[in-house]
Amino acid sequence: MTPRKTKVEVPKSSSQQLGSIVNSSRKIMRKDKGLNGDLDRLPMLTWIMFLKFLDDMEQVREEEAKLAGKKFRQAIDPPYRWRDWASKPDGITGPELIAFINQEEAVRPDGKKGSGLFAYLRSLQSANGDRRDVIAKVFEGTVNRMINGYLLRDVVNKVNGIHFTSRDEIHTLGQLYESMLREMRDAAGDSGEFYTPRPLVKFIVTVVDPVLGETVLDPAAGTGGFLVEAFEHLKRQCKRTEDFFHLQKGTLHGIEPKPLPYLLCQMNLLLHGVEYPEIDPLNALRFPLREIGDKDRVDVIVTNPPFGGEEERGILANFPEDKKTADTALLFLQLIMRKLRRPVGGSTGGRCGMVVPNGVLFGDGICARIKEELLREFNLHTIVRLPNGVFAPYTLIPTNLLFFDRSGPTKHVWYYEQPLPEGRKNYTKTMPIQFEEFATCLAWWKKRQESDRAWKVSVADLLASGCNLDRKNPQAKEDIAHLPAEQLAESIGEKEQRIVEILAHIKLLLVTQGL
């Protein structure tokens, strides 16, 4: 009889172990009737990981303080720390765990009655804006949607196996987290506003090129993709300990008013090594533009602001009378123009790289007035025209990248038409854009010459055309009548989008006039 071969267990790598923990946690969550798909599961997993991450970091800092003979104040007091209620596998579970997390007042893990976990975390505050404020902001809009306390205990036990004190594990988890954000965007379907393709983010940050010592802002931070990329870009410039210290303090700033993206953004930045994320949880457009002064300005803005949405009437009061619009992309463009630092000592001043829909390029009326200010007072030096489907299947609206600084006025605008890979007609969810595809554009960027992909238009020509920035490639041979059906459909879609914008503007006028 031939002896059976025993299967040799191959030790899992750190990446495989972490992937296994995350996947196991998500499988457990699928059994809970309170959760409905990845749109519920990822935020749930995020706040659990956030508390474990925080406790691991606190224990490291506490030990460092002891060795240095210094006092250490914990951000979270007992019995609300992870180590108090979550780290023991046989700890609080079932209905008691749900009650402890959800209720304003509950029996705590130490047996005493007091504030529930979320109620306590939301009440945290500090005098100098430390982690306690960050924690309170994170949990202000966070909800525990799991209803089975036994399943929740199983998830907590899984997450307890992640060691956030290991740099390798944090790096790996950061990558895993990005893949989960992509899945969340996929699950969101038409409302997938959380994720800008990483290759596009990397290209924008690469050409805007933030330098150590500069301040960087994303006024529509979402899940923090631009800030993470800017952090990685700046981290490579750090040569000394002091450099890294300055990078961590006051360099990166984001604004994200929606509770879910705010939580995801905080976690994304923490996992990538940003120790004190400075994310404002309120509306970026809440201040009158005229009140924005030098102290509010920054060196670099990289962003993909929302477009197609509408803002409340109170927000529109913050904008000049002749530039009020229902188009959020145009509102953010005006904000960005005010937020860029003025030139000092021969510098170009603040600079920006941002995503805009085609409607911004060809829009007239209020849109044209905003663009005229951009051309006359800023240096709009480059527009990169993106190919079809960069954001597919979430939107088919054609998009562009604007690059400008405060060294204006504009003399001419360079256009670069980013092509699709050879043989491709579109990007798709399974075959998205890759960073390597920007290699030719990056090579062209510093040695600009006209070519079949690049051309320039004088500002006089642009102003004479009513600030129409929607300039076609003069080398293009296709006539619209001979375009493929798919591209014709997109051209029609572009015009439909413009009609929607005009109708939104008419609606705004009717509301403001009280008609």
Report the location of each language-model feature.
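Non-catalytic, mostly N-terminal accessory regions of nucleic-acid modification and defense proteins
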Residues: 1-212, 278-289, 385-390, 411-419, ...
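S-adenosylmethionine
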Residues: 14, 85, 170, 178-182, ...
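Hydrophobic alpha-helical scaffolding
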Residues: 15, 145, 166, 220, ...
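Short, contiguous acidic/charged loop-to-helix segments that flank catalytic cores in large enzymes
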Residues: 32-35, 312-328, 358-366, 386-394, ...
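Conserved Class I SAM-dependent methyltransferase catalytic core
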Residues: 41, 204, 257-262, 325-403
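Conserved S-adenosyl-L-methionine
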Residues: 190-303, 308-310, 324-326, 330-331, ...
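C-terminal, active-site-flanking charged/polar segments
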Residues: 379-380, 392-440
